[in-house]
Curated annotation (Swiss-Prot):
Pfam families: DNA_photolyase
Gene3D superfamilies: 1.25.40.80, DNA Cyclobutane Dipyrimidine Photolyase, subunit A, domain 3, HUPs
Biased composition (Pro residues): 1-21
Compartment(s): Nucleus
Domain (Photolyase/cryptochrome alpha/beta) ranges: 38-171
This protein's name: Deoxyribodipyrimidine photo-lyase
Keywords: DNA damage, DNA repair, DNA-binding, FAD, Flavoprotein, Lyase, Nucleotide-binding, Nucleus, Phosphoprotein
GO biological process annotation, one example: UV protection
Segment forming the signal sequence: none
Entry-linked InterPro entries: Crypto/Photolyase_FAD-like_sf, Crypto/Photolyase_N_sf, DNA_photolyase_2, DNA_photolyase_2_CS, DNA_photolyase_N, Photolyase_Class-2, Rossmann-like_a/b/a_fold
Keyword Lyase annotated: yes
Residues annotated to bind FAD: 268, 282-285, 319-327, 390, 421, 427-429
Gene source species: Oryza sativa subsp. japonica (Rice)
């Protein structure tokens, strides 16, 4: 892991460095050293796209330099990891992969899909006689454990195969941005800003590689696969206010009809924290989570239009780069990113000091999930997440803090917030989601505030404060309309085993 936050100078691809990616974006996990000329396999994990993908670019560069063919592989994670993914997330994932597979075929790029889990990757590598396996990066435990298992298998059974990991998700690679877990956005922002110009560069074209002449991928019956996987998953209805895939992601960013940067960026700075104005938000988080669009592409395009709305673009870049990549920093350096033990010591102490404080209201997880509390604003935020698949960012803070206030202790509060977030949010099971819950409940990336019952020194939020910031009644009415439309539509479509939520609320 690089010990400093400043990366080495950028070098152009060449015999000594055939990769188009910045050298510090790549980690050599296992050097290998055998099978020269064997295919290069890109194991796609988090970054499910062909365009603007540093991991794919790195793999293609290696293949081109050795006149070797290139293949892409994706393995669906088995249970228990997928137990926390419901029909909502799995449907989006698979429909995106279906589009990706078609795009890969159009480029004559073999795409291997496995349903038996990451354990199938080493077997593919051995069958193909691959020289190098390239994986993209995720800081989450299940993905890191899967990568460790694959590397361990290859070290035992095919030690000549090199294994590289490329951070294709962050503008500044997580291990380069900082060598430690950062305390706050301020400290992280300072480090990232120093090297931003070195990494925020335009993507090159994908290097040309020799035609594929090895084992062909098995055909996939996508309709059957989607139906089977979704039928086995918990029935949280899919959404359709955003379509999966790279083309839809670019349309959401730059579309002439309703693109964020082309049509809506101007109001971002002033309206993004108003839950009654959801169109002020980018709507890009599902695409960023599933890797259908590169954050670097979003940042590059935002910089191009900064002269039109500098304050809004700067605010967007703060969220897109600093805050989002700070979440990866936390999850990378703190393995207990979803536990009270992952909080700073001051936060753990103050929460435990007040864990036995009397609560005015105590709700069960079932009551919270069904939005059965005394607070109509909180109920609305929960219903927005259930029916829309995305809760407004400002409301997520209020929502999580009230869970701390209304459950028996901080551990229960955090586990409940993460459970509900991962179940209903289309971008659940994401570093930003874990950090959002940790910020609200455990004071992560925040400071201590005036001590009070239950919260201790954790920042407090209440109904009156929300009422001063936005039209609470308008938000509640908006969500009621959403929920009513969704329930009606689901009732009409209930014979269909794969139910979707409408785009009418977007």
């Amino acid at each position: 892991m690089p010990p400093t936050s400043v990366s080495p100078p950028r070098t152009a691809p060449g015999p000594a460095n055939p990769s188009p990616a910045h050298p510090s974006r790549v980690r050599v996990i296992h050097p290998g050293g055998g099978k020269p000329g064997g295919p290069v396999v890109y194991w796609m994990l988090r970054d499910q796209r062909l365009a603007d993908n540093w991991a794919l670019l790195h793999a293609a560069g290696l293949a081109a330099a050795s006149a070797s063919p290139l293949a892409v592989a994706f393995a669906l994670f088995p249970r228990p990891f997928l137990l926390s993914a419901r029909r909502r997330q799995l449907g989006f994932l698979l429909r995106g992969l279906r589009r990706l597979a078609a795009d890969a075929a159009a480029r004559h790029l073999p795409f291997f899909l496995f349903t038996g889990g990451p354990a199938e990757i080493p077997a593919l590598v051995r069958r193909l006689g691959a020289s190098t396996l390239v994986a993209d990066f995720s800081p989450l435990r299940p993905v890191r454990e899967a990568l460790d298992a694959v590397v361990g298998d290859l070290r035992r059974e095919a030690p000549g195969v090199a294994v590289h990991q490329v951070d294709a998700h962050n503008v500044v690679p997580v291990w380069t941005a900082s060598a430690k877990m950062e305390y706050s956005a301020k400290t992280f922002r300072g480090k990232v800003s120093k090297v931003m110009d070195e990494y925020l560069v335009e993507f090159p074209e994908l290097p040309a590689v020799v035609p594929w002449d090895r084992e062909q991928p098995e055909g996939v019956d996508w309709d059957a696969l989607i139906a089977r996987v979704c039928s086995e998953a918990e029935n949280v209805p899919e959404i359709d206010w955003c379509e999966p895939g790279e083309e839809a992601a670019i349309e959401a960013l730059l579309g002439s009809k309703d693109g964020f940067l082309t049509k809506r960026i101007k109001s971002y700075e002033t309206d993004r924290n108003d839950p009654t104005k959801p169109r002020a938000l980018s709507g890009l988080s599902p695409y960023l989570h599933f890797g259908h669009i590169s954050a670097q592409r979003c940042a590059l395009e935002a910089k191009k239009c900064r002269h039109l709305s500098p304050k809004s673009v700067d605010a967007f870049l703060e969220e897109l780069v600093v805050r989002r990549e700070l979440a990866d920093n936390f999850c990378y350096y703190q393995p207990q990113y979803d536990s009270l033990s992952g909080a700073w010591e001051w936060a753990r102490k103050t929460l435990m000091d007040h864990a036995a404080d009397k609560r005015e209201h105590i709700y069960t997880r079932e009551q919270l999930e069904n939005a059965k509390t005394h607070d109509p604003l909180w109920n609305a935020s929960q219903l927005e997440m259930v029916h829309h698949g995305k809760m407004h960012g400002f409301m997520r803070m209020y929502w999580a803090k009230k869970i701390l206030e209304w459950t028996s202790g901080p551990e229960e509060a955090l586990s409940t917030a993460i459970y509900l977030n991962d179940k209903y949010e289309i971008d659940g099971r994401d570093p930003s989601g874990y950090v959002g819950c940790m910020w609200s409940i455990c004071g992560l990336h925040d400071q201590g505030w005036k001590e009070r019952p239950v919260f201790g020194k954790i920042r407090y939020m209440n109904y009156a404060g929300c009422k001063r910031k936005f039209d609470v009644d308008a938000y509640i009415s908006y969500v009621k309309r959403l929920a009513g439309q969704s329930k009606k539509r689901n009732a009409e479509e209930s014979p269909n085993p794969v139910v979707k939520l409408s785009k009418s609320q977007h």
